[in-house]
Amino acid sequence: MAESMDIIELIDSDDRFGPTNALLPASGRTDLKEWQKSVQSLLRTLQRPRYVATGLLPEFQQLDARNAFIQNNQLPHYDKAEWKSSDMSLQEKLQIYADAMADDPAPLIEELNARLVALDDIVYCEHYCTEGGLSLDDVDLWARLRSITVIGGVDWPKGLRKYMDNISELADVPTYDGMAI
């Protein structure tokens, strides 16, 4: 995500790409960062297997691409170094992803729903997450929230859902609701 944010900042500040400064800089809000940290493991467990399982995202339509994603993106309770070690085969990783998809997601989704309610309380309004206008905070947060839409059964708080839909429309980038599993 850090490299993507660097690219966005470059494009937004260089007039070769069009009008500049369309986005306010990141605010440095610690509450947003804390929320993101609080759901990291939960989202990895729910999202990553679903990305691969949908088969609908262009980047996962080829078997080699799905395998590369699985090879490089650990699920909890593995750390990155352990996951990437040569001690774990692709077959073992595929099985871990399959097991994650087979597990009942209801308890994790219930926890996620509660965390979304907490986030709804700190998102400034339905048009941007930080007071002052559209900023790099929105680019970061919306991308993370968009990835949640691949998870079926999530109950979005009304304000947060409006925020998601507004940014989706503004950016002309759809959510994954239609392929949620």
Predicted regions located by residue number:
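GST-like domain detector, emphasizing the conserved glutathione-binding G-site
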Residues: M1-Y78
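Non-transmembrane alpha-helical segments in soluble domains
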Residues: I8, D12, K33-Q36, N113-L116, ...
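Short helix-to-loop capping/linker segments positioned immediately adjacent to catalytic or ligand/cofactor-binding
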Residues: N21, Q47, Y124-E131
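Alpha-helical membrane-targeting segments
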Residues: Q61-L63, N67-M101, A180-I181
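A mid-sequence, solvent-exposed acidic-amphipathic segment
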Residues: A81, S85-Y128
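GST superfamily/GST-like fold recognition
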Residues: C129-V150
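Structural helix-adjacent loops and short alpha-helical linkers that scaffold large soluble proteins
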Residues: G153-K158
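Charge-dense, extended regions
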Residues: N166-I181
